[in-house]
Design a protein with these regions (language model features):
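Nucleic acid-machinery interaction/catalytic patches
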Residues: 1-440
Length: 440
């Protein structure tokens, strides 16, 4: 019999994996523990919804790893942000309509730039037109994902006493958001964000009215888009459904948790908005956790608690001394070690003068990690998490010099790929066919 059954409690079923734990690894371990001694095909009817295709591939690999050679028929793993109406979790004919195809991102960018030059800014340089197209596209994507339908009031949002360029920008947006849908309609296409939000809304409505009877697990999503949040709520309430949240802080002070709705910069804000009105934080259960070394568990919990306290909203930091004293008094369930010292163990602060020095330092640290095996002889892995794409690419370039190929999630610039360099040289040659520098 399986030791862990996520569908045993009455719905809605909300679970969470601690921030310090490897999310997809624990998710796969929990799914396989639930599978227990059932036949391998028992998993094939299940639908696993993950945030994106990258997570879907990583989860499939984690399942194979934890299966340990056991034969499995894999579940239907689908990216929540890239659903298609003719694929699971949609049943054939469930929607009763065919949505127009989405315009390709590159085509959209150039069509927007052409529209801006032809209809609004004649004589605008191509580079500036593309920049305005990017800004317009990002604005429309945000509105469509948030399902904001009334965009006609944009021009009235800027007060008369503000700068002229603010008013001009608002007027341009007001005209562009009316002209662009007409241009798309003439092409028989729709925006990708609108199509994605529409599919999620249709799925949420269908599963709310007719809950799925098959096994459905939605994991890793924070439901930042309203339609996605409603899909998660429908999955949690389904007879064989559950939602697994990433990194929910279940130990944060209730008084602080209650204030997160007004603090959009806090890391837990998205989870607060998802759970608000749908489930109480106290009702979220811990997901399956594999066996863990007690020392590593205590160190990990100490670090997680310390970081969570460091991220308290500014309005709730007046009692930090009390919090630190409470952490030490609690000593994390009887552990004798100082939890503050435990939480800081292994953390380093490096101060550098320039970005190149930062890239060199990070690359060296990652190389050292990869070349230092675990006590049992197995290899280590490491990851660099940074919002600075340029820094990530600098680190990847330095690692490449040592024969280490980093998997950069942001992708590679076209100019750094062989095909991109070929196109660049061809364009330069066409522009200046007799230029010796272009030929060389």
């Amino acid at each position: 019999m399986a030791r862990f059954d996520p569908f045993l409690p009455a719905g809605p079923r909300w679970y969470a994996v601690e921030a310090r734990r490897p999310f997809l690894e624990d998710l796969a371990a929990g799914v396989l523990d639930w599978l227990g001694d059932h036949p391998p095909e028992a998993l094939s009817d299940a639908v696993i919804l993950l945030p994106n295709r990258r997570a879907a591939r990583a989860f499939t690999a984690a399942l194979s790893k934890h299966a340990g050679g056991r034969p499995l028929l894999l579940p239907q793993v689908r990216p929540l942000g890239d659903l298609e109406e003719d694929e699971p979790p949609f049943a054939p004919g469930e929607l009763g309509l065919d949505l127009p195809p989405a315009i390709a991102p590159l085509t959209r960018r150039f069509e927007m730039a052409r529209m801006i030059v032809e209809d609004f800014r004649p004589g605008l340089s191509p580079l500036r037109a593309l920049e305005m197209a990017d800004a317009l596209g990002g604005f429309l994507d945000s509105c469509q994902l948030e399902e904001i339908g009334d965009l006609h009031r944009i021009a009235t949002l800027v007060e008369g006493d503000l700068a002229e360029h603010w008013r001009e920008s608002a007027e341009f947006l007001a005209l562009a958001v009316e002209a662009w849908p007409k241009r798309l309609e003439a092409m028989g296409l729709v925006d990708p964000a609108w199509r994605r939000a529409r599919l999620l809304r249709l799925l949420a409505t269908a599963w709310t009215e007719r809950p799925p009877t098959q096994t459905v697990i939605a994991a890793g999503s924070t439901g930042t888009a309203p339609a996605a949040a409603d899909v998660l709520a429908a999955v949690a309430a389904a007879p064989r459904g559950c939602v697994v949240l990433p990194g929910l802080d279940r130990e944060l002070d209730p008084a602080v948790w209650a204030t997160l709705g007004d603090n959009e910069q806090h890391p837990q804000n998205a989870l607060w908005r998802l759970l608000h009105g749908r489930a109480e934080r106290e009702a979220v259960r811990p997901w399956f956790r594999p066996a863990e070394d007690p020392v590593e568990q205590a160190r990990g919990r100490a670090r997680q608690r310390l970081i969570n306290e460091a991220l308290r909203p500014a309005d709730a930091t007046d009692d930090w001394r009390t919090v630190i004293s409470a952490l030490r008094a609690d000593a994390f369930r009887g552990q004798s070690a100082d939890p503050i010292a435990q939480g800081l163990e292994g953390l380093s602060v490096v101060t550098v003068r320039a970005e190149e020095d930062a890239a060199a330092t990070l690359a060296l640290m990652m190389r050292e990690t990869l070349e230092t095996p675990n006590p049992d002889g197995t290899g280590k892995t490491c990851a660099l998490v940074t919002p600075d794409i340029a820094l990530g690419r600098r680190v990847a370039a330095r690692l490449e010099r040592w024969g280490v190929v980093a998997d950069v999630s942001s992708g590679q610039p076209l100019s750094r790929m062989a095909a991109g360099r070929l196109v660049d040289l061809a364009v330069r040659f066409v522009d200046k066919p007799l230029d010796p520098h272009a030929l060389l």
